[in-house]
């Protein structure tokens, strides 16, 4: 019996058989340990709400008021409190259990603009600061430690720095990591593209589940360990399990548990650019799409603003196996003056990632779909044939590169730009607003001339203190 922790929408699941044997006339297949089916929720999400002995209306009011002060600060809107209490009391009057009524009241608070929308931050109001920090870093309410500190008065910069670093270490920060990474890197749209089973028959449900987890765990590790910002471009660590390692061609990782893995330089992996989650979602599921990938690198990592394509120019999706090579097709497209400016910026980044297919695997040659007759039926060998050799070379800002490693080396020369863009993205996430010119100048001043030693948590802390202490919006 296999128990899944969440409903499964797919009518069937495919697991890759890792071992098979015949015993007493029966075939036995092993698919390894399915740790994916175990609830990975942090411990605090597994707490149970216990109904108190006294379930009177007065206790209901006391709990809601205490929660409101913690979630919204010491001085929550009285009208919101009254509305929450009224909904909870009406639920009790209708015969609902105490906990059901309480949840209805608390839901009213959590769905209110006061909680969901970014409030005006008063750095002199300690409880307001506590609520703001918890909302940003935990997507939750402050804990007792934070409340105690802020009740003694406004936090100075050093105290605030200490609290931010402590909160990043807490397991509750994983909610922020998932939300922030989903918005910044586009992982919220990870499920929108699925690699074709004709071209990538080994792509299965387990791999689909673990690919984004690698990225989330990697980013959480950078933040909690305060690793340097250059790990975004290239890194010697990642988080893998056996299924991911097999997909990447990395040996020595056994079991379904995700764990930190030291990457060999020969693995072609390291940093965000070579993660399967990024590589998969920047394709159409068939082709690797250097234009889509290049646009992603340019916008999400480098921070280059991209204007919308001209309305009169048709979309280009280059295909392999045609008379013209992939680069020739793109170069023909960019002969038009209206297209040349943007493609000059984005295409080189995409060319550097051509050694990875639409499922995120390393490749030496392109795959093209092999024509077949009849209705499509899944088969392990797929429906493809090998085509032209991959060309991952290009020119970036006048400097040539031959592959992903040499392109990364060029990107590291622009590390200050990467760090500055990350600061802007984190500011936007924390404040709920794009930085103004004044704020962009302040953010730029936070980046040293040599950002290779700039810690991720250090930069996030500086930006967050600026959001709270220097808020003039």
Where are these regions (language model features)?
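Aromatic, loop-rich ligand-recognition surfaces of beta-strand-rich domains
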Residues: 1-54
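Active-site substrate-binding loop specific to GH73 endo-beta-N-acetylglucosaminidase modules
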Residues: 44-428, 440-473
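Axial heme c-ligation environment in periplasmic c-type cytochrome domains
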Residues: 431-434
């Amino acid at each position: 019996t296999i128990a899944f922790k969440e409903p499964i929408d797919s009518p069937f699941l495919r697991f890759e058989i890792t071992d098979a044997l015949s015993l007493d006339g029966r075939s036995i297949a092993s698919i390894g340990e399915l740790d994916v089916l175990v609830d990975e929720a942090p411990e605090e999400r597994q707490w149970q709400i216990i109904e108190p002995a006294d379930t009177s209306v007065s206790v209901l009011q006391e709990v809601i008021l205490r929660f409101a002060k913690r979630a919204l600060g010491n001085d929550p809107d009285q009208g919101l409190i009254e509305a929450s209490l009224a909904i909870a009391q009406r639920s009790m009057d209708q015969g609902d259990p105490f906990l059901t009524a309480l949840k209805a009241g608390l839901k009213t608070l959590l769905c209110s603009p006061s909680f969901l929308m970014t409030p005006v931050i008063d750095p002199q109001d300690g409880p307001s600061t506590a609520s703001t920090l918890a909302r940003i870093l935990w997507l939750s309410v402050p804990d007792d430690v934070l409340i105690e500190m802020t009740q003694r008065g406004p936090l100075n910069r050093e105290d605030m720095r200490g609290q931010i670093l402590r909160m990043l270490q807490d397991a509750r920060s994983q909610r922020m990591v998932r939300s922030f990474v989903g918005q910044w890197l586009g992982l919220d749209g990870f499920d929108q593209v699925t690699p074709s089973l004709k071209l990538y028959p080994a792509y299965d449900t387990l791999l689909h589940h673990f690919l984004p987890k690698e990225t989330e765990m990697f980013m959480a590790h950078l933040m909690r360990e305060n690793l340097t910002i250059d790990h975004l471009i290239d890194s010697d660590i990642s988080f893998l399990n056996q299924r991911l390692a097999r997909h990447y061609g990395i040996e020595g990782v056994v079991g379904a548990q995700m764990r930190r893995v030291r990457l060999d330089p020969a693995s072609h992996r390291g940093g965000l650019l070579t993660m399967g989650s990024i590589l998969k979602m920047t394709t159409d599921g068939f082709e690797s799409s250097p234009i889509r990938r290049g646009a992603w690198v340019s916008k999400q990592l480098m921070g280059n603003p991209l204007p919308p394509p001209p309305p009169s120019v048709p979309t280009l999706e280059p295909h392999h196996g045609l008379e013209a090579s992939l680069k020739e097709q793109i170069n023909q497209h960019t002969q038009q003056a209206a297209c040349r400016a943007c493609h000059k910026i984005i295409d080189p980044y995409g060319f550097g990632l051509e050694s990875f297919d639409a499922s995120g695997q390393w490749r030496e040659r392109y795959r093209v779909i092999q024509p077949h007759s009849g209705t499509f039926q899944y088969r392990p060998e797929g429906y493809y044939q090998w085509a032209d050799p991959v060309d991952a070379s290009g020119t970036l800002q006048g400097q040539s590169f031959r592959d992903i490693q040499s392109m990364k080396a060029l990107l590291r020369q622009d590390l200050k730009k990467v760090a500055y863009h990350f600061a802007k993205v984190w500011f936007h996430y924390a404040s709920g607003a794009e930085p103004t010119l004044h704020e962009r100048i302040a953010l730029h001043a936070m980046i040293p001339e040599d950002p290779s030693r700039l810690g991720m948590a250090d930069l996030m802390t500086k930006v967050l203190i600026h959001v709270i202490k220097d808020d003039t919006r």
